[in-house]
């Protein structure tokens, strides 16, 4: 299976206020969903000091992009995980991955982030063999069309 790098962007609203959330979702990954190998969802959330629109400042944004790049490369190198979504706004960015193995993902995460100073990250995992979160995110793309 070849993993492409095609993404869509959409706008959503935060659940507790009217701040916008920018959503980026990966498309063309159906073979990975159908494989049944990526049953665990991992959400990595970075809370930040938000500007008046709920977005990170330039310095934080650049660091987030750097972290995102190395995480994507590390997790997808041997298809340990598939990076599927990014939510940014209302004082936090969340990266969503679907993985084959949570313990291996955790080890790779620690190894990949070791060169960085401690980051304000929280990790949430959940079994999601039907890719429900991903499918809900894709509904945002359909609403924008």
Task: Walk through the language-model features, giving the residues of each.
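Charge-rich, low-complexity segments
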Residues: 1-84, 100-106, 134-140, 144
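A short beta-turn/loop motif at secondary-structure boundaries
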Residues: 85-90
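Short cationic amphipathic helices and targeting signals
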Residues: 93-98
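Helical (often loop-to-helix) elements that flank the catalytic cores of nucleotide-handling enzymes
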Residues: 103-118
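Conserved short beta-strand edge segments in small beta-sheet-based binding/regulatory domains
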Residues: 114-145
């Amino acid at each position: 299976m070849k993993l492409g790098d095609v993404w869509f962007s959409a706008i959503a609203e935060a659940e507790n206020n009217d701040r916008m959330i920018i959503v980026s979702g990966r498309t063309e990954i159906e073979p990975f969903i159908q494989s049944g190998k990526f049953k665990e969802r991992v959400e990595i959330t970075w809370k930040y000091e938000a500007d008046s629109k709920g977005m990170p400042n330039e310095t934080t944004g650049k660091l987030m992009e750097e972290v995102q790049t190395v995480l994507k490369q590390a997790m997808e190198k041997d298809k340990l995980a598939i990076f599927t979504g990014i939510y940014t706004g209302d004082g936090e960015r969340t990266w969503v991955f679907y993985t084959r193995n949570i313990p291996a993902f955790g080890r790779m995460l620690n190894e990949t982030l070791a060169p960085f100073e401690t980051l304000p990250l929280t990790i949430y995992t959940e079994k999601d063999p039907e890719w429900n979160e991903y499918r809900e995110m894709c509904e945002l793309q359909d609403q924008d069309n």
